[in-house]
Amino acid sequence: MTVPKEAEGLIGSHYRAPDYFEVGREKIREFALAVKDDHPAHFDESESAAAGYPDMVAPLTFLAIAGRRVQLEIFTKFSIPINIARVIHRDQKFKFHRPILAHDRLYFDTYLDSVIESHGTVLAEIRSEVTDADGKPIVTSVVTMLGEAAHQEADAAATAAAVASISAGKLGAI
């Protein structure tokens, strides 16, 4: 396994998402329904308070909503030499520093920790440090993406089209 030539100098790169993600009570409720998490603390502030939370608490996987948007931006900002139309989410680890609550503003600082290539396949490890408006940590996420290698001859327009298609939820459209 080697570092792809196109990735030299990218490892350690930092990207701060240009805007925060504001956590809304209704988004928490909608997400909890979508993932079939029926814990009452995701639907009722009094239940959250009874469980010891200062506001409505989000399900643990709620970060996926904002995280997906940031993750797609990463592939274009870092120019990772991977064919975005042929990539899978291989692994993800979370370290929760505190629960995500209604009215939180989530800020994403994302780092490209490693990129390796072997036999035409690229593994990229991306770490996101999610903080609140005061800069205090909420969640650390480390995701490993696996995909077909894309080299200099790869078309930037094709990458942009793949990102747009994935964003629109058309996974098989490419």
Curated annotation (Swiss-Prot):
MF terms in GO: (3R)-hydroxyacyl-[acyl-carrier-protein] dehydratase activity
Gene Ontology annotations of biological process type: fatty acid biosynthetic process
Entry superkingdom: Bacteria
Gene3D superfamilies: Hotdog Thioesterase
Domain MaoC-like, residue spans: 11-131
Homology family: Belongs to the UPF0336 family.
Protein name per UniProt: UPF0336 protein MAP_3996c
Lineage: Bacteria, Bacillati, Actinomycetota, Actinomycetes, Mycobacteriales
